[in-house]
């Protein structure tokens, strides 16, 4: 990965359209089945060398793969996604979503009331559905959830467009991974928004996750 996938264009002026589908998501299955080490791929990102995505809808997955072939250039695509998304009842798309549109680097909140929002949660991947269920169960229309479907190249312009609706809100990066893993250090480096960014994460850990589902 270091020798060729992330640096082939910089080193040898060679395009590389490889797609890596990496199982990633905290589902209580232990450290070997929970974490694909996204922080290590994000550390390699520079000069638009990689696409790193963690999508939340079938339509966006389709458009992501379609973009990979339709683009007039080639870049490696790193995809983080858990198996549970295949059967999640909320992870569905209409035929119209599949037939029309294009890949969305970010997806905004359609439930929260912009006039009431006090907190904005930035997240990626399946964690969105857990946050969504809690948001709707507690009727929290004062909390907005923004999905970062593509981490690199970093979609700062799209994020700014979403945050413009919530100018007085506090902004948090929320992740399932421990503080020293996941996308937090990458967000610290890349996020340039007007709203200061805070983090909600598990405590730092030497292991990606616990092996006990009850503790998880």
Give a label for each model feature.
Residues 24-71:
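Conserved thiamine diphosphate
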Residues 6-10, 43-47, 66, 70, ...:
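Generic secondary-structure signature for well-ordered alpha-helical cores
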Residues 20-22, 52-56, 79-81, 173:
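General beta-strand structural signal in soluble alpha/beta enzymes
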Residues 5-6, 61-66, 105-109, 158-159:
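Glycine-rich, charged/polar anion/phosphate-binding loops
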């Amino acid at each position: 990965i270091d020798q060729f996938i992330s640096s082939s264009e910089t080193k040898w002026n060679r395009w590389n359209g490889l797609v890596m589908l990496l199982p990633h998501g905290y589902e209580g299955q232990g450290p070997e089945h929970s974490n694909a080490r996204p922080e290590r791929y994000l550390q390699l990102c520079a000069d638009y060398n990689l696409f790193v995505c963690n999508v939340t809808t079938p339509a966006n997955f389709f458009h992501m793969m379609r973009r990979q072939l339709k683009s007039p250039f080639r870049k490696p695509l790193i995809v983080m996604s858990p198996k549970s998304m295949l059967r999640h009842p909320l992870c569905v798309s209409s035929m119209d979503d599949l037939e029309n549109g294009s890949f969305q680097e970010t997806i905004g909140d359609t439930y929260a009331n912009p006039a009431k929002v006090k907190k904005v949660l930035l997240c990626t991947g399946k964690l969105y559905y857990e946050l969504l269920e809690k948001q709707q169960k507690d009727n929290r229309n004062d909390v907005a959830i923004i999905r970062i479907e593509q981490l690199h190249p970093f979609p700062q312009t799209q994020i700014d467009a979403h945050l413009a609706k919530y100018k007085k809100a506090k902004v948090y990066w929320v992740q399932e991974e421990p503080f020293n893993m996941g996308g937090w250090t990458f967000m610290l480096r890349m996020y340039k928004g007007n709203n200061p960014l805070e983090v909600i994460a598990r405590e730092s850990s030497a292991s990606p996750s616990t092996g006990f589902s009850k503790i998880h």
